[in-house]
Amino acid sequence: MGTIDYSPRGKAVARLKEGLEALRREPENTLYRDGVIQRFEFTYGLCSSMLERCLMHAAPIQPDRKMTFPALIRTASDLGLLHSGWDVWHGFREARNLTSHVYKEEIARQVVEKIPAFAEEAEFLYAELEKTSA
């Protein structure tokens, strides 16, 4: 697995955590909140593609036999790349799907509540992938 460069994903995780820290200091700042939600969106997307790429590299999947997202998460969890399994990641996925509705205050709050746990998962995933590529 040594040929995959995961550093852009690590930068995305760092930026997400930076946004969370700013929001923690000013929890009513909607600009920070919206920025954290946007950083969550792109970090979530990068984590998903990173997992797929990693697993395809480790055990090539035929293009016509692409893993479903739940199977991808379960496999990555079984391999120790994730702290949590599908039950937790399903919640992250639901939050990601809600991000198109963040103009609704209650939905924005629901999404933001899940982001700190996601950031920890993303950081763990990045660290595990860095270990495997070393």
Feature map (PLM): residue ranges:
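Solvent-exposed interaction patches of small proteins and small membrane subunits
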Residues: 1-134
